[in-house]
């Protein structure tokens, strides 16, 4: 996406975010992803976006980072259409935590420091790692922060990679953070550790959480259920459960799945004791 000829550098963001009357389709309109979607986040608010698989929830992050522009409507930050600004200056102030963050074949220290966009001290790196629940596993490695990890972090577990990605975002100090399925593919124990780190990361930041992890979504200030190109319902976790709508139905399926996993684990423990 090219910048407008008159685009200027974005100022420091306060963090208010709005998707206004958003219409978007990847394939020239044949299968619209959004049909007039409206969503506003106050500065510092945490909003979870949930809904059926395959409906394009992650497209919100694609449009916010201007990998595409909407066919109609606009995205505003602090009341300004983001197309007024140079895209690079917008992206510098938005942190993205994807499902599988990119890691380099370099030391853990360099992997953390490279994303900061400024010179960072060892003390800052350690502080960020502690926030991300990564410091203990890093210091347990033979070379600690000087440990060289494989290409794409192949020598680390999925949970360890996500915690390093969270530490990198902490060092960037972005006022807006987008979480795009950050716990997908992790085991239950790793999910819990990463979820706790996310809670600390987004403190005092605006957070858009696109997720199937309803335990993570339930912690948000507000939950938005997206379906058929728009918002089907919106509210707090408690409000949506009381509404007994699509979110409540999804939550019941989630709780049943968790209960089944816990029952299987209990049976396995019983078998190992005999």
Segments (PLM) and residue ranges:
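ABC-type nucleotide-binding domain
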Residues: 3, 10-274
């Amino acid at each position: 996406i090219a910048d407008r000829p008159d685009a200027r550098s974005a100022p420091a963001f306060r963090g208010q975010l709005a998707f206004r009357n958003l219409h978007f389709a990847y394939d020239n309109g044949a299968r619209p992803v959004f049909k007039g979607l409206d969503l506003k986040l106050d500065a510092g608010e945490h909003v979870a976006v949930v809904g059926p698989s395959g409906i394009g929830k992650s497209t919100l992050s694609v449009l916010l980072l201007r990998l595409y522009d909407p066919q109609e409507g606009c995205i505003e930050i602090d009341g300004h259409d983001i197309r007024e600004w140079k895209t690079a200056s917008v992206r510098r102030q938005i942190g993205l935590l994807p499902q599988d963050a990119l890691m380099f074949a370099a030391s853990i220290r360099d992997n953390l420091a490279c994303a900061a966009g400024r010179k960072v001290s060892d003390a800052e790196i350690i502080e960020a790692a502690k926030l991300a629940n990564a410091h203990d596993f890093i210091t347990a490695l033979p070379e600690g922060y000087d440990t060289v990890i494989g290409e794409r972090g192949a020598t680390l577990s999925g949970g360890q990679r996500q915690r390093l990605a969270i530490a990198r975002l902490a060092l960037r100090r972005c006022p807006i953070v987008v979480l795009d399925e950050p716990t997908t593919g992790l085991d239950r124990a790793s999910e819990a550790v990463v979820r706790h780190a996310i809670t600390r990361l987004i403190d005092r930041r605006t957070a858009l959480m696109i997720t199937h992890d309803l335990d993570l979504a339930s912690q948000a200030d507000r939950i938005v259920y997206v379906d058929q190109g728009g918002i089907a319902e919106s509210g707090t976790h408690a409000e949506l459960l009381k509404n007994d709508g699509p979110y409540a139905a999804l939550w019941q399926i989630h709780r049943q799945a968790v209960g089944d996993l816990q029952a299987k684990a209990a049976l396995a423990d019983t078998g190992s004791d005999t």
